[in-house]
A protein has these predicted regions:
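Short, cationic low-complexity segments
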Residues: 222-233
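N-terminal, charged low-complexity regulatory/assembly segments
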Residues: 1-85
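Short, charged/polar, Gly/Pro-enriched secondary-structure boundary elements
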Residues: 162-164, 212-219
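C-terminal edge-of-domain segments
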Residues: 196, 202-212
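Hydrophobic, Leu/Ile/Phe/Ala-enriched alpha-helical segments that form helix-helix packing faces
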Residues: 28, 85, 131, 182-185, ...
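A short, structure-level motif marking secondary-structure boundaries and short turns
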Residues: 66-67, 166-169, 224
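Amphipathic interaction/junction segments at domain boundaries or subunit interfaces
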Residues: 73-168
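Short, hydrophobic/π-rich interface segment
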Residues: 141-201
Length: 233
């Protein structure tokens, strides 16, 4: 089905991104014979429309930067794929799909080194700018701790639409595959993410960010919990 024929409130919502569509079609091609692929894709499209039919309409549409590639609506599209293709997909595949959407941008920033004060301060300023966007839309409720020269950067979300959506539709089992990309993205900036909670399994999603040479990293070793979340002690 052509994307333009999908019936949903396009003033309030956005269509999945082109890179996201490409990812889903590629995975469908891996799992289904050519004669079935279009039918499976249409099922994913229809599931996406069903999901949006009773989804909140205050997320800003195209104006909100969180609704771009790999953002809230792409997560909903990936969850649509997961629902339709659960019998053939896997946790790692979903994790890989989100990585393929998010990580290309961070690979372009490989010159950034969070171990160096200049870049760490610049990263902090980027998070502060992101907070101003969150404050405008009240989607990801974000707070950023004051900057301290010799300490890790800290910010947290106390609301996450993707987590809210997953909880509403009983899809929290796949959320770790969508959240873990946060760790991989920081690693590309010579940084490490230290996290103890997410909005799926707690009241906040915490981000403590430091350089990958910082002793703080060894003090908080990473592990995967029983749900598949990358977390730290």
């Amino acid at each position: 089905m052509k994307d333009k024929k999908l019936l949903f409130d396009r003033k309030s919502h956005v269509l999945y991104s082109k890179p996201c569509k490409k990812e889903i079609l590629a995975k469908i091609a891996l799992h289904y014979p050519e004669t079935e692929r279009e039918t499976v894709w249409e099922k994913v499209q229809r599931q996406y429309v069903v999901f949006l039919s009773d989804w909140r309409t205050d997320l800003g549409g195209k104006k909100n930067f969180h609704n771009g590639v790999g953002g809230t609506y792409d997560c909903i599209a990936i969850m649509s794929y997961y629902v339709v293709c659960k019998a053939v997909t896997s946790f790692r595949e979903i994790e890989e799909m989100e990585e393929n959407l998010i990580l290309p941008t961070f690979r372009k920033l490989k010159f950034v080194d969070c171990n160096k004060p200049f870049w760490r301060k610049l990263m902090y300023k980027a998070f502060v700018r992101a907070k101003s966007g969150c404050d405008k839309w009240h989607d990801y409720e974000m707070s950023v701790a004051p900057y301290e020269t010799d300490k890790p950067i800290y910010y947290e979300f106390t609301a996450c639409p993707a987590a809210e959506f997953a909880i509403k539709h009983g899809l929290t089992d796949i959320m770790p595959a969508l959240c873990n990309v946060d760790f991989a993205s920081m690693e590309l900036l010579h940084a490490r993410l230290i996290r103890t909670n997410t909005c799926v399994n707690g009241c906040r999603c915490d981000y403590t960010i430091c350089g990958d040479h910082d002793p703080y990293v060894k003090e908080h070793p990473e592990y995967r919990d029983e749900a598949g979340f990358r977390r730290n002690k």
